[in-house]
Swiss-Prot record:
Family: Belongs to the UPF0145 family.
A Pfam family recorded for this sequence: YbjQ_1
Name by which UniProt lists this protein: UPF0145 protein BC_5181
Annotated Gene3D superfamilies: Hypothetical protein apc22750. Chain B (3.30.110.70)
Organism: Bacillus cereus (strain ATCC 14579 / DSM 31 / CCUG 7414 / JCM 2152 / NBRC 15305 / NCIMB 9373 / NCTC 2599 / NRRL B-3711)
NCBIfam families: PRK12855.1, PRK12856.1
InterPro entries listed in its UniProt record: UPF0145_dom_sf, UPF0145_YbjQ-like
């Protein structure tokens, strides 16, 4: 399945706009573990532990969105948007959305 942030797919014609699709993932973070990880992993302002959690949440949300598009018989998703939110202390949410299309 082609997934893109753009509204078109180069070299392909969009035959049908099917529906808006989305996916969400909320990940809990272990405060004590993450505190030690941040002390250990922060290099140049980056934390490997948090980046890993964000990637995992993004992958889950993307797969959920693709599954929904497939269920609607779409074969591509255009115009995707990825949002990150802190739901509450220790909870990270990743939400993705886009337009399911047939090419």
């Amino acid at each position: 399945m082609i997934v893109t942030t753009t509204s078109t797919i180069q070299g392909k014609e969009i035959i049908d706009y099917v529906d808006i699709v989305n996916g969400e993932a909320i990940m809990g973070a272990n405060i004590v573990r993450d505190l030690f990880a941040s002390v250990r992993d922060v290099v140049g302002g980056r934390s490997g532990a948090y980046e890993s959690k964000l990637k995992e949440a993004r992958d889950i949300a993307m797969e959920e969105m693709k599954t929904l598009a497939r269920q609607k018989n779409a074969n591509a998703i255009v115009g995707i948007d990825v949002d990150y939110e802190v739901v509450r202390e220790g909870m990270l949410m990743v939400a993705v959305s886009g337009t399911a299309v047939r090419i």
